[in-house]
Amino acid sequence: MIKSEADLSDVIVIRDVWAYNLESEFDLIRGIVEDYPFISMDTEFPGVIYKADLDVLRRGNPNYLYNLLKSNVDALSLIQVGLTLSDADGNLPDLGGQKNRRYIWEFNFRDFDVERDPHAPDSIELLRRHGIDFERNRREGVESERFAELMMSSGLICNESVSWVTFHSAYDFGYLVKILTRRQLPVALREFLGLLRAFFGDRVYDVKHIMRFCEQRLYGGLDRVARSLEVNRAVGKCHQAGSDSLLTWQAFQRMRDLYFVEDGAEKHAGVLYGLEVF
């Protein structure tokens, strides 16, 4: 299924990826990543089943937060990955087709079984309300092992030419590292950050971290930050990984153009919100 919605003169199309079209969609991505080296990413997963101690959370403790992340990611499974590829000017790929149609991707995974696997019920209900069909994912979704194999050869990772743009992405990267390594996350935060750099490079931008350094006071989740920056959602719904990956990219673009024209955002790269180790 392909969903689209007009954004000014362009129509943004979300390419839904299932098991049957996984390889052909990665073929498309492999062919364009050199020209569209900015990759914005979002994931959907079944919430968290291990909760943070609020007092520790307020004080900020990267090692504690990583241990909590590891406990949740090790126990849970990925539901969706959204990818938006762009060039430095913000142009999305047209894939050689109609010039007013631009494309982003949403990968649907089969790993999570809502009837069997641990999850946070309120998170599952939220995702259902926003259109995720867990039964279809189980029937037709992508196997994470095959996704990882194709990602390794896609040019998206282990590639010094690409930049990754995310929002509050420690969990997002946690799930990707888990499926890429096919094992539980490492015990030590520094080892996890080493794997993050090995796979995704040094140019990883977490908008939730970077917005601390903007002149305008920005706070809250992705939708609130986007509204503060006067960025509108171009396609899809919140809590859908493809749509959120595009909104993340557009918020980053606006933030970069407003606050980091002279003093670039590069010096804030490589740090994930909540896991700040300097």
Swiss-Prot record:
GO terms for molecular function: 3'-5' exonuclease activity; metal ion binding; poly(A)-specific ribonuclease activity; RNA binding. The keyword Transcription applies. It is found in: Nucleus; Cytoplasm. It is an enzyme of class 3 (hydrolase). One of its GO terms (cellular component) is nucleus. Its cofactor is a divalent metal cation. The keyword Oxidoreductase does not apply. Its EC number is 3.1.13.4. It catalyses: Exonucleolytic cleavage of poly(A) to 5'-AMP. Its main location: nucleus. GO terms for biological process: defense response to bacterium; nuclear-transcribed mRNA poly(A) tail shortening. Keywords: Cytoplasm, Exonuclease, Hydrolase, Metal-binding, Nuclease, Nucleus, RNA-binding, Transcription, Transcription regulation. Pfam families: CAF1. A divalent metal cation binds at D42, E44, D172, D244. It comes from the Eukaryota. Gene3D superfamilies: Ribonuclease H-like superfamily/Ribonuclease H. Ubiquitous transcription factor required for a diverse set of processes. It is a component of the CCR4 complex involved in the control of gene expression. Belongs to the CAF1 family. Component of the CCR4-NOT complex, at least composed of CRR4 and CAF1 proteins. This is Probable CCR4-associated factor 1 homolog 11. It comes from Arabidopsis thaliana. The gene is CAF1-11.
